[in-house]
Amino acid sequence: TVEQTFINENGKKETKSYVVNKDEGPRAGTSVEALAGLRPVFAADGSVTAGNSSQMSDGAAFVLIMSEEMVKELNLEPIARMVSYAASGVEPRIMGIGPVTAIPKALKQAGLKQDQIDLIELNEAFAAQSLAVVRELDLNPDIVNVNGGAIALGHPLGCTGAKLSVQLFDEMRLRNSKYGIVSMCVGTGQGAAGIFEFLK
């Protein structure tokens, strides 16, 4: 059951509850043969098809970021601490692999090695893009998108950073993890990565 609170068109606070009981992502009748027959979307000889790309979907997430001073002033108990953040870019024609340069940069800023990271949430716009990042950085696939990426769970545009952070924190709590990374590619060759230390 999901509870949604919002301000309606009359300016009054309204709360509604509803049950999410349908996953709109999977399509009935999908088969390996049907997926293999899909045409490439970007280049005639390309590998990216509608079958190995994330669907656009609705989604919402909320993350509140504040200084340590403000946390103390408000007497709050933070869930995680952002250890480092890095943004970088690659050639726009190879859009999708920005995390290949952003993740090492964030690790260096944090003074951490890749093998100290327990979990990674990597945005998965396309399977080929995610696989390229995993391969280029020699990431352990057992700690990347452990509950599925955007192809399985959806890709709500404009919500990626918050959504992946919330997913990371939930899984870090379950596994008693210390360090995790949220990383994503951004259009025109950009990449971003944030390293978090779980505090709960």
Where are these regions (language model features)?
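N-terminal extracellular/periplasmic Venus flytrap/periplasmic-binding protein-like
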Residues: 1-73, 136, 141-143
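Conserved beta-strand-centric core segments of catalytic alpha/beta enzyme folds
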Residues: 49-66, 161-200
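Phosphate/pyrophosphate-binding loops at sites that engage ATP/ADP/AMP, CoA/4′-phosphopantetheine
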Residues: 71-75, 104-119, 137-138
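Short glycine/threonine-rich loop-to-helix capping motif typified by GTGT followed
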Residues: 4-11, 92-99, 124-142, 156-160, ...
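Active-site pocket-shaping loop/turn-to-helix segments
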Residues: 45-61, 83-109, 118, 122-124, ...
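Structural signal for hydrophobic packing residues in well-ordered secondary-structure cores
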Residues: 4, 39-42, 86, 107-110, ...
